[in-house]
Swiss-Prot record:
The keyword Cell membrane does not apply. This is Mediator of RNA polymerase II transcription subunit 21. The keyword Coiled coil applies. Residues 147-190 form a coiled coil. Its main location: nucleus. Residues 74-83 have a biased composition (Low complexity). GO terms for biological process: regulation of transcription by RNA polymerase II. GO terms for cellular component: mediator complex. Component of the Mediator complex. Keywords: Activator, Coiled coil, Nucleus, Transcription, Transcription regulation. Belongs to the Mediator complex subunit 21 family.
C-alpha cells in the first residue's frame, strides 16, 4: 500500500507540473488572434485596440478614452481608444539607429507564436498527456486497499490484521527468549572449554 501511495503522490506531482507547462505553452505561443464575436455584442465590453504581442493587459475602450482625455491632449484629436504601451521608435532617427532600436525592442518581446497547425498539434499532444496521467491516477486509486468495500468489511479486516500482528509479536518474543537461553548455554560451554584449557595446565 505504501508503494501505491508513493506512486500516487508522484503522479499527482507530475500532473501539476504538466498543468503548469501546458498553461505556460498556451500563454506563450498563442497567436493572440481575435476570437469569434458572440451573437450578443453587448455581452462583454469592447476592449481597446492593442498591439500584437503586447505585454500590457487589455482594458475597456471607455477606460482607454478616459485615460487619454485625462492625459490632457491639447488638440483633442486623440479620441480613439489607445492602450498604454511602450513608446514608438523615433521615426526621424537614421536607418542604423532604427535597426538597433528595433533589435533592442525585439529582444524584450516574447517568443514568436507557433503556426496554427503546429499550435493545434502541440495542444492535442499536451491534452493527450494530461488524459493519460489522469488515467494512471485513477488506476492507482482503484487498486488501493479498501476501495469498493463497506465500512463493516474494512473494520473486520482491520481486526483480523490486528490479531495476526499480535500472533506474530508473540512468536517474535518467544524466539527472543529462546535466543537468550541458547546464548547463555554457548557462554557456559565456552567458559568450560576455556577453564579446561588454561585451568589444569602448569609450567
Amino acid at each position: 500500500m505504501a508503494d501505491i501511495l508513493t506512486q500516487l503522490q508522484t503522479c499527482l506531482d507530475q500532473l501539476a507540473t504538466q498543468f503548469y507547462a501546458t498553461i505556460g505553452y498556451l500563454t506563450t505561443y498563442h497567436d493572440n488572434s481575435p476570437a469569434i464575436p458572440p451573437d450578443n455584442p453587448t455581452s462583454a465590453p469592447a476592449l481597446a485596440k492593442i498591439q500584437k504581442n503586447s505585454t500590457n493587459p487589455p482594458i475597456p475602450a471607455g477606460a482607454a478614452a478616459i485615460l487619454n482625455a485625462s492625459q490632457g491632449s491639447p488638440s483633442g484629436a486623440a479620441t480613439g481608444a489607445v492602450t498604454p504601451g511602450p513608446p514608438a521608435p523615433n521615426a526621424s532617427a537614421g536607418s542604423g539607429a532604427g535597426e538597433a532600436g528595433a533589435a533592442r525592442q525585439e529582444e524584450g518581446l516574447p517568443p514568436r507564436p507557433d503556426s496554427p497547425r503546429t499550435f493545434t498539434a502541440r495542444q492535442r499532444e499536451l491534452a493527450r498527456d494530461l488524459v493519460i496521467k489522469e488515467q494512471q491516477i485513477e488506476y492507482l486509486i482503484s487498486v488501493l486497499p479498501g476501495i469498493g468495500s463497506s465500512e463493516a468489511e474494512q473494520e473486520r479486516r482491520i481486526r483480523k490484521l490486528e490479531e495476526e500482528l499480535r500472533a506474530v509479536e508473540e512468536e517474535r518474543e518467544k524466539r527472543v527468549r529462546e535466543l537468550r537461553v541458547l546464548r547463555r548455554r554457548v557462554e557456559e560451554v565456552l567458559g568450560a572449554v576455556e577453564g579446561g584449557i588454561y585451568g589444569g595446565s602448569s609450567y
